[in-house]
């Protein structure tokens, strides 16, 4: 959410559905960018190539709006009787769609939702007040952040009527290394992967560019190998490091390939107070800001709600295809 817009209009960050509607309406009708024109978007929506709700991280989707009704389209959910039900056709999804339709009818959601070719365009043009996305959305708004043009802050919103924040969880992985039954030495794949992970940080320290590192010649079996809680660990370490509670000697970098460089950068980029991650509390003019600030903002702003607040995770009960899906879809 554009914190600078909230501040300029004297609004608090929304938590409930009704509060979200109030803020979105203010962003549309009260000229939060101060240009005297009726040209702002309350809530950004997906483009014509994206999804309103998806499995996993869905930037610009409306997933939290569905989840606030405990609706999970495209997910298989275990019902009260133990059977597995498809989330797209549950009553909660109908309820969510009705409320989302109201937002759209009242022009609180992007009028060009699902028609616009690129949802990023109005976002980078400074015309959007709210969008939904994963923690790494800090990279998406990097240009506006580096220019000091927009203070984006992350929130869990909207909460469900019971006061909880529900969120669907992504699949554990979507990338695989596969050895066929004809492979004579399948253990070689494990050895290669272990070697790559073990040496990644050393190569970075030696000056190997990330562009070179992802080529197949340099990095066979390239994949994303990381701890499931990598970002939460990074948030915890960085905030404690800024607070003076730990030093680099207290951190094991062997399985955290970017954490050392993050710690080195954050002390140069963060202004006091060290627990305030507002836009004006960063050294935007630093010569290392361009290469480091987007990631630090993604972690310390984008992942803050996941670390500081409780949420109810909802998992997909079935990740395969049914016979009907195979023949009809």
Language model: regions and residue ranges:
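Active-site-adjacent bridging/hinge elements
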Residues: 1, 68-77, 101-108, 162-174, ...
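Helix-loop-helix "hinge/cap" segment bordering the ligand-binding cleft or interdomain interface
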Residues: 1-57, 78-127, 177-212
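Short, solvent-exposed loop/beta-turn-alpha elements that line the ligand-binding surface or hinge
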Residues: 12, 73-91, 160-167, 222-246, ...
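Conserved oxyanion/phosphate-binding beta-strand-loop segments in alpha/beta enzyme cores
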Residues: 51-72
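Glycine-centered hinge/linker elements that transmit conformational signals in sensory
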Residues: 78-110, 156-160, 243-269
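Alpha-to-beta junction loops
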Residues: 125-137
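Ligand-binding "clamshell"
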Residues: 141-162
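Conserved small-residue motifs centered on glycine
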Residues: 201-329
């Amino acid at each position: 959410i554009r914190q600078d817009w909230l501040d300029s209009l004297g609004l608090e960050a929304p938590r409930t559905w009704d509060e979200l509607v109030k803020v979105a309406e203010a962003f549309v009708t009260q000229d939060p960018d101060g240009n005297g024109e009726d040209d702002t978007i309350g809530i950004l929506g997906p483009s014509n190539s994206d999804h309103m709700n998806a499995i996993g991280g869905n930037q610009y989707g409306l997933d939290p709006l569905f989840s606030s009704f405990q609706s999970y389209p495209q997910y298989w959910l275990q019902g009260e009787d133990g059977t597995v039900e498809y989330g797209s056709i549950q009553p909660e999804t109908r309820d969510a769609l009705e409320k989302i339709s109201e937002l759209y009818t009242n022009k609180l959601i992007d009028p060009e939702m699902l028609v616009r070719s690129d949802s990023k365009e109005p976002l980078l043009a400074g015309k959007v007040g709210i969008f939904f996305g994963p923690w790494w959305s800090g990279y998406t708004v990097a240009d506006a952040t580096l220019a000091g043009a927009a203070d984006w802050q992350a929130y869990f919103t909207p909460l469900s009527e019971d006061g909880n924040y529900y969120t669907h969880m992504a699949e554990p992985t979507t990338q695989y290394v596969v050895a066929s039954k004809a492979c004579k030495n399948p253990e070689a794949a494990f050895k290669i992967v272990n070697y790559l992970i073990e040496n990644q940080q050393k190569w970075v320290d030696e000056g190997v560019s990330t562009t070179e590192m992802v080529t197949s010649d340099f990095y066979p079996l390239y994949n994303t190998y990381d701890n499931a809680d990598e970002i939460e660990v990074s948030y915890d370490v960085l905030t404690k490091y800024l607070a003076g509670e730990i030093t680099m000697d207290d951190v094991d970098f062997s399985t955290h390939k970017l954490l050392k460089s993050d710690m080195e950068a954050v002390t140069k980029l963060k202004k006091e107070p060290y627990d305030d991650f507002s836009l004006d509390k960063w050294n935007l003019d630093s010569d290392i800001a361009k290469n480091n600030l987007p990631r630090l903002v993604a972690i310390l702003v984008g992942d803050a709600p996941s670390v500081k607040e409780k949420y109810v995770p909802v998992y997909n009960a079935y990740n395969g295809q049914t016979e009907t899906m195979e023949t009809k879809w």
